[in-house]
Amino acid sequence: MSLLELFCHVDDFWQQFSWFWEAELLKSGLKQRRRAGKLYPSEIMTLLIYFHQMRYRDFKTYYTQYVQVYLTDEFPHLVSYNRFVELILSVLVPLCAYLRSCYGDCTGISFIDSTPLAVCHNRRIPQHRTFAGIAQRGKNSVSWFFGFKLHLVVNDRGELLALG
């Protein structure tokens, strides 16, 4: 999928989802500024999804060496890398809803697979604090790991059905 097609798809989703999301947000009773940012949420979501389609290993290199250099025509109001990282949290819920909207339909034939998401090396388990109490030791076909296990269910067309 090209960047333009991806943006159109995400922006169409955002146009429908934003009304629902605004209605469901809790009101604090205090007056709050509702000033629009430089980047629309659909642009932030597009850049995050497009990162996974590119062959960059880390997000900082992708944003500073690709987005800020080659995508300035497509996204004229880009923010700095540090500000973009702060904005990611604001689109987490819409991004999860977008993922859920992209799920396929069950066709009768489904495949399930799992992959480990290691959070640290096995030697560092006693010093690990980020996911302390949440992450656990696990085993896959290759070795032991400390972290989480991601399970994916796909149909025979390669469409995502569920994850856990």
Where do the model's predicted regions map?
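Short alpha-helical elements
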Residues: 1-164
